[in-house]
Amino acid sequence: KIISREERCLNYLQDTVKTVYKVLRKTEKYMAIQYDYINEILPHDIFFITTKELEDLYPDSTPKEREYYITKEKGAVCLMQIGDLLASGVKHDGRAPDYDDWTLNADILVYYPVLDIALELSSMGIRVDKEALLSQLDKAGCPERANLPFQKAIIDETLPFTIGGGIGQSRICMFFLRKAHIG
């Protein structure tokens, strides 16, 4: 989706997450009406936290363990700012340097009691602008990518600012049907 320069901010990302989460809750409500064995488990609101804040909460845990602990506690979590190094010197998770802005991206995670896991339902982000792209290419050790056609178009500011992401269709089906696997 094309956005304005002013919309390249945390508030816009969080508003987008809230919109997606509202649809997830409506879908769960519908499924609970249709199927007797399905109960609503998603909390009313999604909990927002950065990877830095999460590492500060659980400094002795792995990134996946941190996701599990916070998601089990909160029910639904928007984990933001994925891709850069944390205070520990490691990344929470890898992200391409020329895709999402690492300061403006997020995963939607829900606690899934059927498998006792943190289940990622969506990954999204405001895409890199010139400054974020150059910084992230440098941090990733691949500044030469700045000469590739797509990356050059971002640097030359000939492409619009955008936000995008994906929904894990199989995971969504598995979650809403309360199944251990789909397929």
Regions found by a protein language model. Name each.
Residues 52-183:
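A translation/RNA-centric and nucleic-acid-associated enzymatic feature enriched
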Residues 1-4:
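Class II aminoacyl-tRNA synthetase-like tRNA-binding/catalytic domains
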Residues 6-11, 131:
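Short, conserved charged micro-motifs
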Residues 24-61:
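Alpha-helical scaffold segments that mediate packing/assembly in large oligomeric complexes
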Residues 9-28:
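A conserved active-site cap/scaffold subdomain adjacent to cofactor or substrate pockets
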